[in-house]
């Protein structure tokens, strides 16, 4: 999910050519609520076979620029104000389009099982949470990484980072702990949160990943049962 924060028709993600405080506060909120956002974006057991270390999918709660080992990625360099279309097509006239309006950040954990309505509402709640956190900028600084965290030389940094849940059962536990943030201002009703938690726990998959990791036959059965989205 790529997102940007708009105000009066203007993108608020950049200021003076760098990521703005507004953007970094929103990212901090996503860092804090990332564990429970999986309850909306990773909703069946096969989701957690994707969220494993050393793959393209994220497992650690961190963010960075153009870095595919992070959970929240800041893509491209829209702050450069370069008309890439004109560079690729030199006979075309420059568009004079303000490319800084395109700057987004990407939440990389959700997959095809996501309930999009709940997910987008949850991400909006997380961004709002970041605006309300007095230490949001410190959280953003602490969770920023500019290296591949899966390389051996960066293992000390990796150890400092929290991890995403590894099952629907763990995701349900995270949502239960953080539910107050989503119920605030009546964005999510308590009954809806209860229903999501109950559904996630119904899979009883707390140890499923380790149980089937060496069994291609069981893995295939799970894929056929749950991999029906997207």
Q: Residue ranges of each PLM-predicted region?
A:
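C-terminal accessory/tail domains of diverse enzymes
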Residues: 7, 15-230
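Active-site-proximal loop/hinge segments that shape catalytic or ion-binding/gating pockets
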Residues: 11
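Histidine-centered divalent-metal-coordination microenvironment in nucleic-acid enzymes
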Residues: 1-8
């Amino acid at each position: 999910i790529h997102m940007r924060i708009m105000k009066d028709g203007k993108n608020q993600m950049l200021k003076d050519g760098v990521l703005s405080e507004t953007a970094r506060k929103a990212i901090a909120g996503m860092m804090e609520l990332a564990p429970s956002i999986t309850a909306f974006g990773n909703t069946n057991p096969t989701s957690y076979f994707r969220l494993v270390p050393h793959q393209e999918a994220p497992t650690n709660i961190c963010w960075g620029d153009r870095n595919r080992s992070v959970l929240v990625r800041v893509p491209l360099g829209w702050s450069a104000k370069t008309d890439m279309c004109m560079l690729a097509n030199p006979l075309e006239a420059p568009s004079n389009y303000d490319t800084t309006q395109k700057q987004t950040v990407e939440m990389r954990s959700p997959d095809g099982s996501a309930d999009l309505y709940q997910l987008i509402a949850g991400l909006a709640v997380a961004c709002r949470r970041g605006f309300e956190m007095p230490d949001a900028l410190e959280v953003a600084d602490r969770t920023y990484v500019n290296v591949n965290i899966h390389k051996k030389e960066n293992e000390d940094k990796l150890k400092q980072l929290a991890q995403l849940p590894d099952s629907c059962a763990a995701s349900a536990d995270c949502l239960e702990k953080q539910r107050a943030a989503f119920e605030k201002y009546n964005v999510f009703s308590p009954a809806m949160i209860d229903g999501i938690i109950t559904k996630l726990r119904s899979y009883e998959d707390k140890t499923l990943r380790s149980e089937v990791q060496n069994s291609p036959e069981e893995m295939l059965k799970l894929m056929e049962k749950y991999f029906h989205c997207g």
